[in-house]
Structure formats: structure tokens, C-alpha cells
Regions:
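Conserved Nudix-box catalytic region and its N-terminal flanking loop in Nudix hydrolases
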Residues: 23-67, 161-168, 173
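Active-site-proximal alpha-helix that buttresses catalytic centers in soluble enzyme cores
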Residues: 44, 55, 143-229, 258, ...
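Non-catalytic terminal regions with compositionally biased, polar/charged low complexity
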Residues: 126-132, 136, 262, 266, ...
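Active-site-adjacent alpha-helix immediately C-terminal to a catalytic or transition-state-stabilizing loop
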Residues: 235-293
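A short coil-to-beta-strand element that immediately follows conserved catalytic motifs
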Residues: 67-76, 214-219
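N-terminal strand-loop-strand
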Residues: 1-41, 147-152
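Nudix hydrolase/Nudix homology domain
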Residues: 37-38, 104-157
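Unchanged
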Residues: 46-69, 77-129
Length: 308
């Protein structure tokens, strides 16, 4: 096998079969590619420097014409791609995506789109890897509740700040990270924003609040001062925040997030390989009712202001 790994991303694009009757379930979008004469799920190669999420949303929009609300991660599919006589490994990152608006227009690359029930989609898909991915989607409910657990952005050094620590603001790097988080987190269409009552936490989500016109509510239980002794309250808050099928953003601190994640994943018997919590990073937590189904880590956005 020669050549480097091809990175790609895509989505299982779904919508309710009947918006007024949830019991009728969902249907998914399957596309036909005339070049290969196959039926597949929408996906494509990442552009240079493009993140997996940005690439997935761009490719789904380009191939289907639909804007989406990002849902839970569906993991990777891996296979070998033959290109010009060279075999190269290909890794595709996938997300569940709810169609929110759009219209399909045929192109040279995709000449047909069908909205079909899950069983029919499984029979129609040409590649085994796509069928396996659809099975992953089916194993979890489509309309899940999402909590985006964000660590505050860069705020300089605690030792260099002469005022009360809870008043320490974001630095230039932190403001750049906060601005970039708007683009990332807006893909999930948050309907509620909660922050620890520390200035650097509220400032981290202020740009998102302005862009989404969603107010920021503070809750001291997510702060390093309010969390000790109230751990059970914080876990309970995570389980109910955002409503039955909404998306909430919670901005917290590095002394809180690892322990909070460990408590809720242990309680729901979900194993994490590691619990990272870098400044401006995000954990995407997906729930069915109040039970945690998945936890996926998104590293901090890369911004020039933080390169020095």
C-alpha cells in the first residue's frame, strides 16, 4: 500500500417521516453518484486545513443541498481507496445530522437523492461500510439531547493576575478562541447557554450568545468554587439541561470538567479512553432522556493569536 491516508467526512442526514407524529420514525437521505453508479451516504474529502466537522457539513450541503443541525458522532469508517493504480487508506468521520432547510438540485456528481425509511436505505446502499454506519445510527435514537461542555478559553496566568481570580478576563488568544468557537458550536444550533460564574467563562460564550441571540445564564455549580460538595447537583443539572431534544452549551473550568465527566460516565457505564480538557476544548455529550449515550472530545480551535 502506497500513499498517505485520505481524510474525509460526512453525515447520516435524517428527518422525521411525519413532523406531527414522532412515532412514525425517521427517514434518511441516500444519494446516487453517476460516476460510480452507486447509492451512498453524503461524504467527501477534507480541504487542506479543514476540520472534520466543517468538512462534513460542507460536503453534506454540497451533495444534498440541505443545511443541518449537528448531532452525535457516529465514529469512523475505514477502507482502502484505489486511485490511479495506488492503494491508499481512507478514513471517514461521520455525524448524525438533522435536515433543517434546503432543496436538492441534481449535479454532475450527484444526480438523485432519495428520502427513504431506514430498512429501505440499508437495502439500497451499495457499500458495506455505509450499511454498517447506518446500523450504528439505528442503534441510537436520532433526536437526542446534546450538551456541549466547554472549558473556558485562554485567560492568561493565574499567578500574574492581581485581582480576584473570578474576575480574570480572557486574553487575546482567548478572545480569538471564543470567536472561533461560535462557528463550531453554532453547527449544533444551541438553544440554551449556561456558564460558571467566572468572568473568563462568561466571556468565552458571549460571542456565541450574541450570534445565536441566546442569553447566558450563570450557575455556580459549574465553577471551581461552587462544584466541590455539590458534585451530585452538577451531574443532575447536566442530565436535565436543554430540555427533551434541545442543545445546551455549558462553560466550565479545568478543575471541574474531568471529575464531572468521570462521575456521569461511571454512573452510565460509558468508558472513555481519556478525559482531556484543554482551554477552549469541547465535550459533545449526547443523551437519551437523562441517560448519557456518548461523549466525544473536540480539541480547541486553532487560531493564529495562540501560536506564539
Amino acid at each position: 500500500m502506497n500513499g498517505g491516508t485520505i481524510r474525509a467526512a460526512g453525515g447520516v442526514l435524517w428527518r422525521a417521516r411525519d413532523p406531527w407524529d414522532a412515532s412514525r420514525g425517521v427517514e434518511v437521505a441516500i444519494i446516487h453518484r453517476p460516476r460510480y453508479d452507486d447509492w451512498s451516504l453524503p461524504k467527501g474529502k477534507l480541504a487542506a486545513g479543514e476540520s472534520d466537522i466543517d468538512g462534513a457539513i460542507r460536503e453534506v450541503l454540497e451533495e444534498t443541498g440541505f443545511h443541518v443541525r449537528l448531532g452525535r458522532s457516529l465514529g469512523d469508517t475505514r477502507y482502502v481507496k484505489e486511485m490511479d493504480g495506488v492503494s491508499r487508506p481512507k478514513v471517514v468521520r461521520w455525524w448524525a445530522m438533522e435536515a433543517t432547510a434546503g432543496t436538492f438540485v441534481p449535479t454532475r456528481e450527484v444526480d438523485e437523492l432519495r428520502w427513504v425509511p431506514l430498512g429501505e436505505a440499508h437495502e439500497l446502499l451499495s457499500r458495506e461500510t455505509d450499511r454498517e454506519l447506518l446500523e450504528r445510527f439505528v442503534r441510537g435514537p436520532a433526536p437526542t439531547r446534546v450538551v456541549l461542555l466547554v472549558r473556558h478559553a485562554s485567560a492568561g496566568s493565574r499567578s500574574a493576575w492581581t485581582g480576584e481570580d473570578r474576575t480574570r478576563p480572557l486574553d487575546l488568544c482567548g478572545w480569538a478562541q471564543a470567536d472561533e468557537l461560535v462557528r463550531l458550536l453554532a453547527h449544533f444550533d444551541p438553544t440554551e447557554i449556561v456558564s460558571a460564574d467566572y468572568r473568563r467563562c462568561t466571556q468565552t460564550v458571549e460571542p456565541l450568545s450574541g450570534a445565536m441571540t441566546v442569553p447566558v445564564h450563570t450557575d455556580p455549580v459549574f465553577s471551581e468554587a461552587g462544584y466541590p460538595g455539590c458534585e451530585a447537583d452538577a451531574v443532575a443539572r447536566l442530565r436535565e439541561i436543554g430540555g427533551p431534544h434541545g442543545t445546551a452549551v455549558v462553560c466550565s473550568q479545568g478543575d471541574v470538567i474531568p471529575d464531572l465527566l468521570k462521575r456521569i460516565t461511571d454512573a452510565d457505564e460509558l468508558r472513555l479512553a481519556s478525559v482531556e480538557s484543554r482551554k477552549a476544548s469541547t465535550w459533545v455529550l449526547t443523551f437519551l432522556d437523562d441517560r448519557l449515550l456518548g461523549a466525544d472530545y473536540l480539541p480547541p480551535p486553532r487560531v493564529p493569536e495562540c501560536e506564539n
